[in-house]
Design a protein with these regions (language model features):
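Hydrophobic "anchor" residues on beta-strands that sit immediately upstream
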Residues: 8-10, 64, 194
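Short, structured coil segments at secondary-structure junctions
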Residues: 59-62, 69, 77, 147-149, ...
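Conserved acidic, metal-coordinating active-site core of Asp-based
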Residues: 98, 102-208
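Active-site phosphate-binding/coordination module
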Residues: 20-119
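Mg2+-dependent phosphoryl-transfer enzymes with acidic/Ser/Thr/Gly-rich catalytic loops
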Residues: 3-6, 25, 169, 174-251
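Short active-site oxyanion
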Residues: 38-42, 62-63, 127-129, 191-192, ...
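A short acidic, helix-capping loop that chelates divalent metal ions and anchors anionic groups
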Residues: 74, 81-82, 161-165, 222-223
């Protein structure tokens, strides 16, 4: 069996890089910085672009980063959007109207800015909508109710795995799309990219890369889609993944 040759690293944010309080451990920060000295590194998150750019800058990452569940690629140094794929306006308006009718909290990214109520939307160039759900069942029902053929829908959880989100992006747009775009612009071979995550919205990314790695606290269906499983967030699992699949092979 040929040795794995790492060419890049993609890391989920909540539950992988940071905890519920948005804290990053020192071992994880050191490991990410060490990896970035060897291969292109990007955060791949469902979060809004400002959050992704903030943590990328903390780590000194300079290559394009992935926000909005793959619908937005950004320059972390300037915060400028390099590439975006909004969902159809009819879908975004329909989803927002229904969420507000039901009294469900959500956030959306419209033209790169976060909106949490209909009054905050401006151009309806919406790349992602993430609606809060009390549990997995409620999340799945929401996705089924509001889905359409022009959308990609996926559940996700917060860093602690306690809160669920129903995520909506344009059809064909996911962290998997973001991984392909990242590989193209950085020149990293997809077969050599290490992707580390803990939630369902990481599954499309796992399907695209050569080394999908699940965090130890990830749900069974996420672990089963991974090639390897590392320690949990509390055990600095991301640092373990970087040591095993980036630093050691390139030492």
């Amino acid at each position: 069996m040929p040795l794995f040759k790492p060419t890049g690293l993609l890391v989920d944010l909540d539950g992988t890089l940071i905890d519920r309080e948005s804290r990053m451990s020192r071992p994880v920060a050191r490991a990410v910085k060490a990896a970035a000295a060897l291969v292109p590194v990007a955060i791949a998150s469902g979060r809004e672009p400002d959050d992704v750019a903030h943590f990328a800058r903390l780590l000194g990452l300079t290559c394009p980063q992935i926000a909005d569940n793959g619908a937005r690629i950004l320059d972390p140094m300037t915060g400028r959007t390099l590439h975006e794929l909004p969902m159809p306006e009819l879908d975004s308006r329909r989803i927002v109207d229904e969420l507000e009718t039901r009294g469900i909290k959500y956030y959306a990214v419209d033209g790169g800015r976060v909106a949490r109520s209909r009054a905050e939307f401006t151009g309806w160039s919406v790349t992602v909508i993430a609606a809060h759900a009390v549990d997995r069942g409620a999340c799945d029902r929401l996705l089924a109710d509001l889905s359409s053929g022009s959308l990609h829908v996926v559940p996700s959880t917060d860093a602690g795995g306690s809160y669920w989100y129903a995520n909506f992006t344009r059809a064909g747009v996911s962290k998997g799309y973001g991984a392909r775009y990242f590989a193209r612009v950085t020149g990293a071979d997809l077969a050599g990219i290490v992707a580390v995550g803990d939630s369902h919205n990481d599954l499309p990314m796992f399907a695209e890369v050569g080394m999908p790695v699940a965090m130890g606290h990830a749900r069974p269906e996420v672990k089963s889609a991974a090639a390897e499983v590392v320690g949990s967030l509390d055990q600095d699992g991301l640092a373990e993944a970087i040591e095993r699949f980036i630093l050691t092979p390139l030492s």
